[in-house]
Regions:
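Active-site-flanking beta-strand signature of metal-NTP-handling nucleotidyl enzymes
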Residues: 4-12, 54-56
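Short catalytic/ligand-binding loop motif for oxyanion handling, primarily in non-cytosolic enzymes
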Residues: 51-53, 63-66, 107-108
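An amphipathic, aromatic/His-enriched active-site/gating alpha helix that lines ligand/cofactor pockets
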Residues: 28-40, 58-99
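Short, surface-exposed ligand-recognition loops at beta-strand->loop->(often short) alpha-helix junctions
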Residues: 11-23
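A short beta-turn/loop motif at secondary-structure boundaries
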Residues: 44-50
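Basic/polar N-terminal segments that are highly enriched at the extreme N-terminus
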Residues: 1-2, 109
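Feature marks short, surface-exposed loop/turn motifs that line or immediately flank catalytic pockets
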Residues: 15-17, 47, 61-63
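Short, low-order "capping/linker" segments at domain edges
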Residues: 99-109
Length: 109
């Protein structure tokens, strides 16, 4: 069974607008390239811990023989993604924390 995949990145950032601007720039750049299953990103602000944010990057299946998680791994290996990761770390207050999830249920199907 092919499932969507989400990478959750928990970060601390003193300038969330800059973080969101960078992610919007990333999304715009990805709209014109081979994005390897990339479906989009959401940024959530923690209501209980100011300055803490969760970035959720969603990936879907493009080729039925390649899982969405493998699509995400391919995306992470791209030079553009690695360069963006370096830039993003420069605006963070601490190292990001990564978590990986397979989608098992979705209401909009």
């Amino acid at each position: 069974m092919n499932r969507n995949f989400s990478q959750m990145i928990t970060v601390r950032c003193s300038d969330p607008q800059l973080l969101c601007d960078m992610l919007a720039e990333w999304d715009l750049a990805q709209a014109t390239t081979d994005i390897m299953g990339y479906m989009g990103t959401r940024v959530l602000a923690d209501r209980e811990k100011m300055g803490r944010y969760v970035i959720i990057a969603d990936f879907g299946v493009v080729d039925p023989s390649v899982s969405a998680a493998d699509e995400a791994a391919r995306n992470n290996a791209r030079p553009e993604t690695r360069a963006f990761s370096v830039r993003m770390r420069e605006v963070l207050d601490d190292d990001p924390e990564f978590h990986h999830f397979d989608e098992i249920y979705r209401t909009d199907r």
